[in-house]
């Protein structure tokens, strides 16, 4: 054991709690949306994509971590580490790029930079495909030799190698690529879209250009998506910051808990998206009841 057995027991219990909550709420989101035709709107396709991403994390990552924490180390070998790291990375990246698509959709619908544009089913499918392609370009390279997945923190889960300069894996270039293309760029797009969105909402309210009902509906959707972005930042920013610090300070001493806490805090992202969606979408709640 790298730390006390009680810490591994607490970790296992935490993962069990995430599975207990994460699987039902994400499955419920999928089931209710697919079962009710009026919920099958283009925007909801992207929200469904978030639920699928969260289920990847729950089934492919959380179950593995709970099992390994019961043993005190990663018992599933190289293949298990690759699978767990891949599913956790894929789920997190699909969620991030889905939020990018949602931000762009909100910007185009509310700010109207393209006149007479309507977000259709085809646009939603293109957005889904884009989020998957971008997520795969982040999750697949460590499986084929550009960087690698290794056990991290308390050695019960696997992630991208930020820790070493292992020969033959080009870990440095991959970390720089990942932080630039799969973290800074998407966040910049999200912040740009919501910056413009807030300005447009204020201007529309001042000019009373649209009916009060339309304005209220757009505001509710925008508020829901903004909350999802804030939730993503709260969950993933500590992990990204610690990973970057470790990458920039290789050779420095730090305990296993240092990386474990932000890594497992990030995993709560599989719960907050469906809960925000369920709590803030009246139509969904009516269909669910």
From Swiss-Prot:
Site (Plays an important role in the conformation switch to the active conformation): 84
KW Metal-binding (keyword) present: no
Gene Ontology annotations for the cellular component aspect, listed alphabetically: membrane; photoreceptor disc membrane; plasma membrane
GO molecular function: 11-cis retinal binding; G protein-coupled photoreceptor activity
Topology feature Extracellular, residues: 1-7, 68-81, 145-173, 246-257
Function, as annotated: Photoreceptor required for image-forming vision at low light intensity. While most salt water fish species use retinal as chromophore, most freshwater fish use 3-dehydroretinal, or a mixture of retinal and 3-dehydroretinal. Light-induced isomerization of 11-cis to all-trans retinal triggers a conformational change that activates signaling via G-proteins. Subsequent receptor phosphorylation mediates displacement of the bound G-protein alpha subunit by arrestin and terminates signaling.
UniProt-recorded name of the protein: Rhodopsin
Naturally occurring in which organism (per UniProt): Procottus jeittelesii (Red sculpin)
